[in-house]
From Swiss-Prot:
Keywords: ATP-binding, Magnesium, Nucleotide-binding, Transferase, tRNA processing
HAMAP family per the UniProt record, alphabetical: IPP_trans
Region of interest: Interaction with substrate tRNA: 33-36
Residue sites binding substrate per the record: T10, G11, T12, G13, K14, S15
Example GO molecular function: ATP binding
Residues marked Interaction with substrate tRNA (site): S99, R120
The protein, known as: tRNA dimethylallyltransferase
Stored Gene3D superfamilies: 1.10.20.140, P-loop containing nucleotide triphosphate hydrolases (3.40.50.300)
Cofactors, names only: Mg(2+)
Organism, as annotated: Tropheryma whipplei (strain Twist)
Transmembrane regions listed in the UniProt entry: none
Enzyme class, spelled out: transferase
SUPFAM superfamilies: P-loop containing nucleoside triphosphate hydrolases
UniProt-listed Enzyme Commission number(s): 2.5.1.75
C-alpha cells in the first residue's frame, strides 16, 4: 500500500502543505521531525497547535519527555507501526519532516546496529570527565578511516558504542537499501531568497510567541536531556536565561544555526532517487502540483 513522504528543508512549507494534502486525500500525519517528538517543546520546534491541525490525526508528536533521549531506531519501529495502523483504517499515511536520518529510517527501511545502555553510559561519563576529544582520538586509532567531526559528541559516542559491541567498523547505519517502492517522496524546495526571509520570520516568531518563557518552564519542569538542551533555539534561550548572551545575540545565533540546518537538509534529501521535486516559492502553485502528483499516484480523476 502507498504512503507519502513530505521532505525538505525547514521553512519550505512541509507542515502546511502536507496538512492540506491529508485533508484532501483522507490522510494521517506521521511526524518525522526529531525535535517534535518531545513534549512541551512547542514554540521552538514550530509544532502546529491542536486547532491548526484541523482535526487531521497526527502521530509521533509529544511522545517522549525532554529529559529523555530520542532514538532513531525506536522511532523507526513506532513510525512503521503507525503507518500499518493508518493503512488498516483505509487512510493514507503522510510521513512529514526534515530530520534526514529519521525520514530515511522509514523510507529506506534502514537497519541499525544494536545498542547497549551500559556501554553508552560509560562512554558518556568518560566524555563528561575527560572531554569528547579523548574519545575522538581513540575512535580514530581504532578505525583510522572513520570520518567524524571532533565536536560531534553524539556520533563519536555512538560510533565507539557500535565498535565495542560488534567489533566491526563503527558505521552507525547499515548500508542504505533501495527506497521502498510504496513511498511517494515529495521533496519541497524553495528559492534561496524566499527561504532566507521565511527563516528570519520563523526565528522572530519563536521569540515573539514566547520561546524564552517556554524554556523557562521547561527548566522548571524537567532536567533537560542533552538533545533538548542543545536544540536550535533552546540552547540560545538557555544561554540568555543564564545571562551568558543578550536576547539579540540569541536570535542571531538561532537564525544562523537554522540556516545551516536548512542547507544540510537540502543536501541530504537531494540524494533521494525517484522523488518529485516541488518548488514552494509560491505555495498555492506548489499545492496544485502536489494535488496533481497525488491524483496520478492514487489514480484519482
Amino acid at each position: 500500500m502507498l504512503a507519502v513522504a513530505f521532505v525538505g528543508a525547514t521553512g519550505t512549507g512541509k507542515s502546511l502543505l502536507s496538512l492540506d494534502a491529508a485533508r484532501d486525500f483522507n490522510g494521517h500525519i506521521v511526524n518525522a521531525d526529531s525535535m517534535q517528538l518531545y513534549r512541551d517543546m512547542d514554540i521552538g520546534t514550530a509544532k502546529l497547535s491542536h486547532s491548526a491541525r484541523q482535526g487531521i490525526p497526527h502521530h509521533q508528536i509529544d511522545v517522549i519527555d525532554p529529559s529523555s533521549e530520542a532514538s532513531v531506531a525506536r522511532y523507526k519501529l513506532s513510525a512503521q507501526t503507525c503507518i500499518k495502523h493508518i493503512h488498516a483504517l483505509n487512510s493514507i499515511p503522510f510521513l512529514v519532516g526534515g530530520s534526514g536520518l529519521y525520514v530515511s529510517s522509514v523510507v529506506h527501511n534502514l537497519q541499525f546496529p544494536p545498542t547497549d545502555g551500559r556501554v553508552r553510559k560509560l562512554l558518556e561519563d568518560e566524555a563528561d570527565k575527560s572531554g569528547i576529544g579523548v574519545l575522538h582520538d581513540r575512535l580514530l586509532k581504532l578505525h583510522p578511516g572513520f570520518t567524524v567531526s571532533r565536536g560531534n559528541r553524539r556520533r563519536i559516542i555512538r560510533a565507539l558504542e557500535v565498535a565495542y559491541i560488534t567489533g566491526r567498523s563503527p558505521n552507525p547505519v547499515l548500508p542504505l537499501q533501495n527506497r521502498a517502492n510504496n513511498f511517494i517522496v515529495i521533496n519541497l524546495i524553495c528559492d534561496k531568497g524566499t527561504l532566507d526571509i521565511r527563516l528570519q520570520k520563523r526565528v522572530e516568531s519563536f521569540y515573539d510567541n514566547g520561546l524564552i518563557d517556554e524554556v523557562r518552564l521547561l527548566q522548571e519542569k524537567y532536567v533537560l536531556g542533552r538533545t533538548a538542551a542543545k536544540a536550535i533555539g533552546y540552547k540560545q534561550a538557555i544561554m540568555y536565561l543564564a545571562g551568558e548572551i543578550s536576547c539579540a545575540d540569541a536570535k542571531d545565533s538561532t537564525l544562523q544555526e537554522t540556516i545551516r540546518l536548512a542547507n544540510k537538509q537540502i543536501k541530504w534529501f537531494r540524494r533521494y532517487s525517484g522523488q518529485h521535486i516541488v518548488d514552494t516559492t509560491d505555495m498555492s502553485v506548489a499545492y496544485e502540483q502536489i494535488r496533481s502528483i497525488l491524483n496520478k499516484s492514487f489514480r484519482i480523476s
